[in-house]
Design a protein with these regions (language model features):
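Short, acidic/turn-prone active-site loops that include or flank metal/cofactor-
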Residues: 13-17, 66-67, 94-95, 142-145
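Conserved beta-alpha-beta core of the PfkB/ribokinase-like small-molecule kinase fold
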Residues: 34-109, 117, 126-128
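Short, charged, surface-exposed secondary-structure boundary motifs
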Residues: 19-21, 72-73, 99, 146-151
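Conserved N-terminal subdomain of the carbohydrate kinase-like
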Residues: 1-37
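Conserved phosphate-binding/catalytic region of the ribokinase-like
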Residues: 57, 76, 104-185
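Structured loop/turn residues at beta-strand edges in well-structured enzyme cores
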Residues: 27-30, 84, 114
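Residues that scaffold the ATP/ADP-binding catalytic core of kinase and kinase-like folds
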Residues: 10, 99, 185
């Protein structure tokens, strides 16, 4: 862990990397308000079949792009998911910028406005942004925190946002809920 609370990670999925469509409980997916998927688990073969099956039966879908290396590795597939199959997308600014080959954040906003999806982007010290249809919602960071390790902050952010979203909070309130959760890291 560096002094600014950053870290270097190398994931090993173990048996999770062997998930396939037989592991998807269709009834559980149908019963869920939102089916959340992790970019870390997406891969060709069995995992792709599992994602496709879950997406087919889901009421709403959400996915985290998870990591810049995942975006680089699966760029075309992730772009297809974002454009055509997902309802809510979570990413940090670097991940989303890389996904769409944006020059700057204005390009990200312009691209996202045209999708008709909910794009949620964390921006580090710049806070977070949600873009839904043509509207942009911004939320600042919580201050005066003594963060030691940022591992899991994005996961907590997504869980807080989704908690707000399924409980009919506004997009702005859902961003704040995500910020509050990620601040507990």
């Amino acid at each position: 862990i560096t002094p600014d609370s950053e870290r270097t990670m190398c994931t090993f999925l173990g048996t999770a990397g062997k998930i396939d469509d037989n592991d998807i409980d269709i009834q559980a997916v149908k019963n869920a308000e939102i089916t959340f998927m992790e970019g870390y688990l997406w891969d060709e073969g069995g995992p792709k079949k599992a994602f496709d099956k879950a997406i087919l039966h889901a009421n709403k879908t959400a996915m985290s792009l998870s990591d810049l290396f995942c975006v680089d590795r699966h760029k075309m597939n992730f772009l297809d998911l974002v454009k055509n199959k997902l309802d809510i997308i979570f990413a940090n600014e670097q991940e989303f910028t890389t996904l769409i080959d944006a020059k700057d954040f204005k390009d990200v906003v312009s691209f996202s406005k045209n999708l008709g999806k909910t794009i949620v982007i964390t921006r580090g010290e710049k806070g977070s942004v949600a873009i839904k249809d043509s509207l942009i919602y911004e939320n600042s960071i919580n201050t005066n925190l003594k963060i030691v390790d940022l591992t899991g902050a994005g996961d907590l952010f997504a869980s807080g946002f989704l908690h707000g979203y399924i409980n009919n909070f506004s997009i702005k309130e859902s961003l704040q809920e995500g910020t509050n959760m990620s601040s507990k890291i």
